[in-house]
A protein has these predicted regions:
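Proteins enriched for Cys/Gly/acidic motifs involved in redox and nucleic-acid/cofactor modification
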Residues: 2-250, 289, 326-337, 361, ...
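Terminal RNA-binding accessory module
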Residues: 5-7, 12-15, 20, 34-35, ...
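Conserved SAM/AdoMet-binding glycine-rich loop
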Residues: 117-122, 129-131, 234-357, 368
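Structural recognition of alpha->loop->beta junctions
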Residues: 137-152, 262-273, 296-301, 362-374
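Short flexible coil/turn linkers enriched for glycine and charged/polar residues
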Residues: 188-191, 201-203, 300, 310, ...
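Conserved, mostly hydrophobic/aromatic
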Residues: 205, 225, 242, 278, ...
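A structural motif corresponding to the C-terminal lobe/cap of the Radical SAM core domain
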Residues: 300-302, 314-430, 435, 442, ...
């Protein structure tokens, strides 16, 4: 039998949820990323594999991680067997997200045994959790380096100490630090880009782990964002998606500037880039200026992801969402009036602790009223350290699943209705490339963020083309390219 590879960490800085919960009145500093010369070239002739889970925030972070690694000389690979360094950029949002990562880490052990020089790293939101770190030490003691969401910039030092000095470290900061501008970035796409506009979240929805794993809300300066979008436009990018956990809180932390998300959208809409999207919006903070900017800005796409979570006022209150069903519906009405044809998508949690049949029916009735054209629906998952994890939840697993199925059945009918409205119409599609399911078809997204499959040998990735929609389904549409 091969010996189990077990790592004892040479240095440990472990996360603390208690520390992470606190919000300090400290000014945000902006720092530039610099790669120290001793870290250059240590990845030469070595390959890395990055496995990313979770939201767009993590996808964007992974592009920075890849940028840093390539600056250090590493080159990318697709197969675990070829890798000298495997990094898991993880998500902690629900228990099943965590289980997936642990499953993958368990599976990776065999590569560690085959290649004793393989380095394994873990970062992202799970690294910010105390129980994850405990579990790593106990059950997966072959991970070489652990770092958190607040210190991606530490990666070169951690790789260096593990690879060159054979010192393995856990290095997780519980409290957010400076905003790093000019991080190296290796963008996945040549025509669609993520642009972080802010970090962290101060909403503290009672079910959610994000305010603990991502720290307090910190906005990037408008000039830096505008400059980045201008550069992307110049480089031929067709679409940018502005990122933040609660983009509508953008700018609220500026002490010297009265500048909000609406102002930013207005300014960005003047840049010559075809498509601007953003995610995610918090319904309470979505204001008139933002709606006006969406209505006026020709390049602000007519799609809004506005997570409602529940249709019951009682549950919204227990979730600490700080808006009522009526206020949410008012905003939807305003959006539909000011931006005719806007597509609205959402997130919904079922079986939140104490959710009664009546509460759940309120959610169903809200779905009928809004007619969402897309949604992510979840069964509530308790997160250690969040208030809701201590609330009583008497529902059985079967009852929870039943609610999810019932909700999905209803909501899917509106996905179809939302796409049917485009049958026979001509829409603009940003071409993504080959369809995953059918190599003879191309695929892309409309302005309303709906997937279209079509056949053509004349168009290429990154083109914005006109398509006539021939058939609509719940999850996608078929189209024909119009000359
Ligand atoms: N900041 C965004 C996204 C947060 S995470 C927002 O506020 O909308 C994405 C979604 O995951 C949430 O909208 C919520 O529906 C879901 N979610 C978050 N925590 C959850 C939990 N503990 N159990 C189940 N779903 C959860
Ligand atoms: Fe989580 Fe709420 Fe913040 Fe979204 S707004 S990240 S759901 S705490
Ligand atoms: Fe997951 Fe963290 Fe994003 S918990 S959803 S990766 S902010």
């Amino acid at each position: 039998m091969k010996k189990k590879v077990t790592i004892n960490y040479d240095e440990e800085l472990n996360p603390s949820i208690k520390e992470a919960r606190m919000r300090r009145n400290k000014d945000v500093n902006f720092t530039s990323f610099i790669l120290e010369p001793q870290y250059l070239n240590i990845g030469l002739n070595k390959k890395y594999l990055l496995k990313t889970y979770g939201c767009q925030g993590n996808l964007a972070d992974s592009e920075n991680i890849a940028g840093i690694l390539e600056l250090m000389g590493f080159s990318p690979c697709n197969e675990e067997i070829d890798a000298d360094l495997i990094i898991f950029n993880t998500c902690a949002i629900r228990e099943n997200a965590e289980e997936r990562v642990f499953g993958e880490i368990g599976r990776i052990e065999k590569f560690r045994k085959q290649n004793p020089n393989l380095l394994i790293g873990l970062c992202g939101c799970m690294a910010q959790e105390e129980h994850t770190i405990e579990k790593i030490k106990k059950t997966y003691p072959y991970i070489n380096i652990v770092f958190g969401t607040h210190n991606i910039y530490s990666l070169p030092e951690l790789v260096y100490s593990s690879l060159i000095e054979q010192k393995n470290k856990i290095d997780v900061l519980s409290i957010e630090g400076d905003i790093y501008e000019n991080m190296p970035v290796k963008r996945e796409s040549k025509y669609k880009a993520w642009v972080n506009i802010m970090y962290g979240c101060d909403e503290f929805c009672t079910y959610c782990i994000v305010p603990y794993t991502r720290g307090k809300e910190r906005s990037r300066r408008p000039e830096a964002i505008i400059e980045e979008v201008k550069e992307l436009a110049k480089a031929g990018y067709k679409e940018v998606t502005l990122l933040g956990q609660n983009v509508n809180a953008y700018g609220k932390d500026f002490k010297d500037l009265n500048y909000t998300f609406g102002n930013l959208l207005m300014d960005l809409s003047k840049i010559d880039i075809p498509r601007i999207r953003y995610t995610t919006s918090h319904p309470r903070d979505l204001d008139d200026l933002t709606i006006d900017a969406m209505a006026l800005g020709k390049n602000i796409m007519p799609h809004l992801h506005l997570p409602v979570q529940s249709g019951s006022n009682e549950i919204l209150k227990k979730m600490n969402r700080k808006y009522t069903r009526e206020e949410y519906l008012d905003k939807i009405k305003k959006l539909k009036e000011k931006i005719p044809g806007i597509s609205i998508t959402t997130d919904i949690i079922v079986a939140f602790p104490t959710e009664t049949e009546e509460d759940f029916n309120e959610t169903l009735s809200l779905v009928k009223e809004v007619e969402f054209e897309g949604a992510y629906t979840f069964i509530y998952s308790p997160r250690i350290g969040t208030p809701a994890a201590t609330y009583p939840n008497p529902l059985t697993e079967d009852e929870k699943k039943e609610r999810l199925l019932k909700l999905n059945d209803l909501i899917n009918s509106y996905f179809l209705k939302g796409r049917k409205r485009f049958e026979g119409k001509i829409v603009e599609v940003l071409v993504d490339g080959e369809s995953k399911n059918n190599k003879d078809m191309l695929t892309g997204y409309t302005e309303h963020n709906m997937l279209v499959n079509f056949a053509s040998n004349k168009v290429k990735e990154g083109d914005i083309i006109k398509c006539k929609i021939t058939k609509a389904y719940s999850w996608h549409m078929l189209g024909e390219v119009v000359e």
